[in-house]
Curated annotation (Swiss-Prot):
Top-level taxonomy: Eukaryota, Fungi, Dikarya, Ascomycota, Saccharomycotina
EC number of this enzyme: 2.1.1.221
Basic residues bias: start-end ranges: 56-67
Active site: D223 (proton acceptor)
Name used for this protein in its record: tRNA (guanine(9)-N1)-methyltransferase
GN (gene name): TRM10
One GO MF term: tRNA (guanosine(9)-N1)-methyltransferase activity
Length: 360
C-alpha cells in the first residue's frame, strides 16, 4: 500500500506540487485590501511567473496534435479512403483562404464600445476576443460588411495595445476614438439618423432584411445580463430606431434572447453569404444545440427538422480565449487568461469559440 502511495506521489507534476504549496501559504492581507483582492493579486503574480512555460507546453501539444492528424490523413489518402476527418481537413484549409475580392453590401456595422466602464477586466478581455473573431469573419466573408469599432479609447484600447498590437494592421476596419456614440451620429439630420438602427434583444421589432445604406449598431458589452435594457434605453435617448434579429424563429434560449457581439456580426455576414436567408445563417454561426432545427427549406421554421432530431453538442468553452487581465486559473493546471489573443499559429485568425453576454 505504501509503495502505491509513493508511486502516486512521484507521478504528481511539479506544477501540482507548487499549487498545493501555494494553497498552504498563510495569507497575510496587506492593509487596505480585502482577502479576495489580495488572493487575486497573488494568482496574477503566479500566472505572470508561469505563463511562458504554460504557453510553450500548449504550443507543443497543438503541434503534436497537428502531426498526428496529418499522419492519419496521409494514411487515409494512401489507402484511397475518404473519411470525415479528411473531408473536414480540406474544408478547413479552404475556409482559411480569404477571398481576393469582396462584394460590396452598402451595409455598415458599428460596435458601440462606450460601455467600457461597466465591464470588469475579464469581460474586457472577452470583448476584445469577440472583436478579433468578428474581424476574422469579415476578412473571410465573400461580402464586404463595413465595420467600425467606436469609443475605442479606454480599457479596451489598452487591452488591444498590450495583447493584440497587430490590430492597427487590420484592413477595412475602422477604430474610432470618440467619447460618446452621438459624437459620430448625424444628430442634426433626422433623415440621415433614421438610417441608423440599434440592435437590442429588448424589442419586438424584428429585422428581416439588412437594408443598403443603413448602419446597424451592436452594443459592445459583455455583462452576463447584469444590465437590463441597456442598449434599448441608450437607443431611445438618442432617438434611434431599434430592432432585433429573428432569434426566436431559429434558436432556443432560456430567458432573454441575447447573443454575443461576435455572433451578431457573423450572422450579418452569413446572411449575405446565404442568399439573405436568416435560417441558414443561424445554422452556420451558432452551436448546433441552440438551433431549433437544421433548415432544409430556406428559412421557414415550419419546414425545419424537429429540435429532437438535431444532435446535441456542447457549446465551446471560454477557456481558449486566453485573456490578459485579471488572470485566474480555471483548474489546477490551466489559467484562464493569457498575454495573446486567440490566434492560430499559422495565421492571424482567431478561434471560433463563443463568448456570451452582449445585449443583442
Amino acid at each position: 500500500m505504501e509503495n502505491q502511495d509513493t508511486e502516486q506521489s512521484q507521478k504528481r507534476s511539479g506544477s501540482e506540487v507548487e499549487k498545493d504549496d501555494f494553497k498552504r501559504q498563510k495569507v497575510v492581507v496587506p492593509e487596505g485590501m480585502t482577502k479576495r483582492e489580495y488572493k487575486r493579486q497573488l494568482k496574477q503574480q503566479r500566472w505572470e511567473e508561469t505563463k511562458d512555460e504554460y504557453k510553450q507546453k500548449k504550443r507543443e501539444k497543438k503541434k503534436a496534435a497537428r502531426e498526428r492528424r496529418k499522419e492519419r490523413i496521409k494514411e487515409a489518402e494512401a489507402n484511397g479512403e475518404t473519411n470525415e476527418e479528411l473531408y473536414n481537413y480540406h474544408q478547413m484549409k479552404r475556409a482559411k483562404v480569404a477571398p481576393q475580392e469582396q462584394i460590396d453590401t452598402d451595409v455598415k456595422i458599428i460596435m458601440d464600445c462606450e460601455f467600457d466602464s461597466l465591464m470588469n477586466d475579464k469581460e474586457i478581455v472577452s470583448l476584445s476576443n469577440q472583436i478579433t473573431r468578428s474581424y476574422s469573419a469579415k476578412k473571410h466573408s465573400t461580402y464586404d460588411v463595413q465595420l467600425d469599432i467606436t469609443s475605442f479609447n479606454k480599457n479596451l484600447k489598452k487591452r488591444f495595445e498590450k495583447a493584440i498590437p497587430q490590430y492597427d494592421k487590420w484592413t477595412n476596419v475602422t477604430f474610432v476614438e470618440n467619447d460618446k456614440l452621438e459624437d459620430i451620429l448625424p444628430m442634426d439630420d433626422k433623415q440621415a439618423l433614421s438610417k441608423y438602427v440599434y440592435l437590442t434583444a429588448d424589442t419586438d421589432e424584428v429585422i428581416d432584411t439588412l437594408e443598403p445604406h443603413h448602419t446597424y449598431i451592436i452594443g459592445g458589452i459583455v455583462d452576463k445580463n447584469r444590465y437590463k435594457n441597456l442598449c434599448l434605453n441608450k437607443a431611445q435617448s438618442l432617438g434611434l430606431k431599434i430592432g432585433r434579429l429573428p432569434i426566436d424563429k431559429f434558436i432556443k434560449m432560456n430567458g432573454r434572447q441575447v447573443l454575443a457581439t461576435s455572433h451578431v456580426f457573423e450572422l450579418c455576414c452569413k446572411w449575405f453569404e446565404n442568399d439573405k436567408d436568416w435560417g441558414k445563417a443561424f445554422n452556420e454561426v451558432l452551436p448546433p444545440r441552440k438551433v431549433k432545427g437544421k433548415l432544409t427549406h430556406g428559412s421557414d421554421p415550419e419546414k425545419s427538422i424537429e429540435p429532437s432530431e438535431v444532435s446535441e453538442q456542447p457549446v465551446s468553452s471560454e477557456q481558449s480565449e486566453q485573456p490578459v487581465l485579471s488572470e485566474q486559473p480555471v483548474s489546477s493546471e490551466q489559467p484562464v487568461l493569457s498575454e495573446q489573443p486567440v490566434l492560430s499559429e499559422s495565421s492571424d485568425e482567431p478561434s471560433d469559440e463563443p463568448s456570451k453576454g452582449a445585449d443583442h
